[in-house]
Amino acid sequence: MTKKMRRVGKYEVGRTIGEGTFAKVKFARNTDTGDNVAIKIMAKSTILKNRMVDQIKREISIMKIVRHPNIVRLYEVLASPSKIYIVLEFVTGGELFDRIVHKGRLEESESRKYFQQLVDAVAHCHCKGVYHRDLKPENLLLDTNGNLKVSDFGLSALPQEGVELLRTTCGTPNYVAPEVLSGQGYDGSAADIWSCGVILFVILAGYLPFSETDLPGLYRKINAAEFSCPPWFSAEVKFLIHRILDPNPKTRIQIQGIKKDPWFRLNYVPIRAREEEEVNLDDIRAVFDGIEGSYVAENVERNDEGPLMMNAFEMITLSQGLNLSALFDRRQDFVKRQTRFVSRREPSEIIANIEAVANSMGFKSHTRNFKTRLEGLSSIKAGQLAVVIEIYEVAPSLFMVDVRKAAGETLEYHKFYKKLCSKLENIIWRATEGIPKSEILRTITF
């Protein structure tokens, strides 16, 4: 089978770990230090075509400004003649949303810890004049120690000098404040606080406070703050949530008030921000202003005769998500996205089965180089869902099928994945089927 080696400057780039409309995020390793990183890759042609230069500049600048232990760190920005590479901290614990899906809902003590860390991160952003505007569990990651990391500053805003109100409607509808939906000017700080309240409700309840199958109905509920807390919520957390989900931004509780709340303060240990470092924006200017000689070397070797061979350092980072628990020790409290499975069928047979099942579910499929994209309506018929499926060889005649969301609601994606797997039982391999651990370890490439 074929093996892919790709280098971008000092980074050895591996598999795709995330994909959106305008960018891919790939796992990579710094060959100088051996550290793992995530690299967000964007085509310059796409950025120019969609007039996103200012937005990308803003996202990079903001991530350089807001350095905090509970915010994903940006290391550097690189460029080739055709692409931009944003090198980020690699967060290994998956999304907070994955933990909610795995457990159904979280206990108050665990929810409180995550909420405290979220509020600390948001407060740090606000003191720097930055408003996130797209806070939701999918943008909250967990590290190996279970600490929260805020990510995805693509919709963030820095207010213009002398302008106190923001006017652009951004974010995921279920988490957006009423004043944002109104289309009038709004205070970015108050809007972020509302989103934090929705997140707190979701991690405690396991479902959204505001949910409808049509947008007008959803907007009506949000504008009226029409929700009810389940019976397992304590009186103290109910009181705090109602103060946060106040539809009037002028009377809504502020960060300082949240930090004084008795429920919030229980076992609260404030996180200190990283020591102030001089913010250097020269690499951003170099990337976007096309300074001569600023390009990083990019080297790709690939033929398309078979799936990518996954090497050892990629396998290790995936070990806790794979259903190959006999290979590696596994922490029982470690939850990572597990929307992937293993098969011993030929790649062409795997793809044919996936396409047939997807078509029966009403999804269109497009396959190239052992990578399949599926597109269709989500189960609630309220929006599009796009899924990317890629096959990797992890050992001779043993293939990992990685399934990830490219667009759409995360909860709908998990429903889709469960249904897809239930229809692919004939090709999914279980570890009990008898391949020795020693055989797999011996055949992983280094």
Curated annotation (Swiss-Prot):
Catalytic activity: L-seryl-[protein] + ATP = O-phospho-L-seryl-[protein] + ADP + H(+); L-threonyl-[protein] + ATP = O-phospho-L-threonyl-[protein] + ADP + H(+)
The enzyme's E.C. designation: 2.7.11.1
Post-translational modification: Autophosphorylated.
Result, substituting residue 156 to D: Increases kinase activity
Record note on what altering residue 168 to D does: Increases kinase activity
UniProt domain NAF: residue ranges: 305-329
GO BP: any one term: signal transduction
Region feature (PPI): 336-365
Residues found modified as Phosphoserine: 156
The protein's role, per its UniProt record: Involved in the regulatory pathway for the control of intracellular Na(+) and K(+) homeostasis and salt tolerance. Activates the vacuolar H(+)/Ca(2+) antiporter CAX1 and operates in synergy with CBL4/SOS3 to activate the plasma membrane Na(+)/H(+) antiporter SOS1. CIPK serine-threonine protein kinases interact with CBL proteins. Binding of a CBL protein to the regulatory NAF domain of CIPK protein lead to the activation of the kinase in a calcium-dependent manner. Phosphorylates CBL1, CBL4 and CBL10.
Domain free text: The activation loop within the kinase domain is the target of phosphorylation/activation by upstream protein kinases. The PPI motif mediates the interaction with the ABI (abscisic acid-insensitive) phosphatases. The C-terminal part (309-446) of the protein is required for the phosphorylation of CBL, but is not involved in autophosphorylation.
Similarity comment: Belongs to the protein kinase superfamily. CAMK Ser/Thr protein kinase family. SNF1 subfamily.
Protein name stated in the entry: CBL-interacting serine/threonine-protein kinase 24
Gene source species: Arabidopsis thaliana (Mouse-ear cress)
